[in-house]
A protein has these predicted regions:
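Extreme N-terminal, non-catalytic leader segments
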Residues: 1-5
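Hydrophobic anchor at the beta1->P-loop junction of P-loop NTPases
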Residues: 9
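P-loop (Walker A) phosphate-binding loop of NTP-binding proteins
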Residues: 12
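Conserved lysine of the Walker
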Residues: 17
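Hydrophobic positions on the alpha1 helix immediately C-terminal to the Walker A/P-loop
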Residues: 20
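ATP-dependent small-molecule kinase phosphotransfer cores
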Residues: 27, 33-124, 201
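A glycine- and Lys/Arg-enriched "phosphate-lid" helix/loop adjacent to the NTP-binding pocket
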Residues: 101-173
Length: 215
């Protein structure tokens, strides 16, 4: 069986990646492709337990503890869902993956980047996305979108939604840096464009990936 594709969507809070991941999956299924949509943290049984601690703003975590939690989640995710899904020939779409760890814990929290990358390599077991789409917008825009989305609804802001604006600006810098470091893998799309335009640009990037494999 031919190997599938591993695609990740990344971005700051409120960038629209979760919505676009679902839209991309629908578009690819309409083309007759087998698709799995997943997310980090929390899309395994162990991950669900980790996610509760990881995102709870009332639990004080040392930066190393925070990092190791998300990496434990990733190790389970790779073993249980990501690698089996791709090896079975699916297009696997993950809402967040390793670039989020570099952006949030590395750039946002200031954890040592070389060490973080080494630990991330252990968690991923060398599984690298075929394509990463970063939905980019200023941190101010993303936070405003997040607050507008939950306006009038019962919502408890998680550990990262509760962070100060400067933290989210550093996180954005981390995602932009990833695109500069690995331009072949990481593509930036302006998420301030219309929903339809963003959708079209994501699908075009994915089609380019698939067509390149077929050449």
């Amino acid at each position: 069986m031919a190997r599938g594709f591993f695609i990740t969507l990344e971005g700051v809070e409120g960038s629209g990646k979760t919505t676009q991941a679902a839209t991309l999956a629908d578009a690819l299924r309409n083309e007759g492709r087998a698709v799995i949509v997943t997310h980090e943290p929390g899309d395994t049984r162990a991950g669900e337990a980790i996610r509760k601690i990881f995102l709870d703003p009332e639990i004080s975590l040392d930066i190393a503890s925070e990092l190791l939690l998300v990496l434990a989640d990733r190790a389970q995710h790779v073993r249980e869902k990501l690698r089996p899904g791709v090896e079975a020939g699916n297009v696997v779409i993950s809402d967040r993956y390793s670039d989020s760890t570099v952006a949030y814990q590395g750039y946002g929290r200031g954890f040592d980047l070389p060490l973080l990358r080494q630990l991330n390599q252990l968690a991923t077991a060398g599984m690298i996305p075929d394509l990463t789409i970063v939905l980019d917008c200023p941190a101010e825009v993303g936070i405003a979108r997040t607050r507008e989305r939950v306006k009038g609804k019962p919502h408890k802001f998680d550990r990262f939604e509760s962070e100060m604006l400067e933290f989210h600006r550093r996180v954005r810098e981390g995602f932009l840096a990833a695109a500069k470091e690995e331009p072949e893998r990481v593509k930036i799309i302006d998420s301030q464009q219309s929903y339809e335009t963003v959708t079209a640009e994501i699908l075009a990037a994915v089609h380019q990936l698939i067509e390149a494999r077929c050449r």
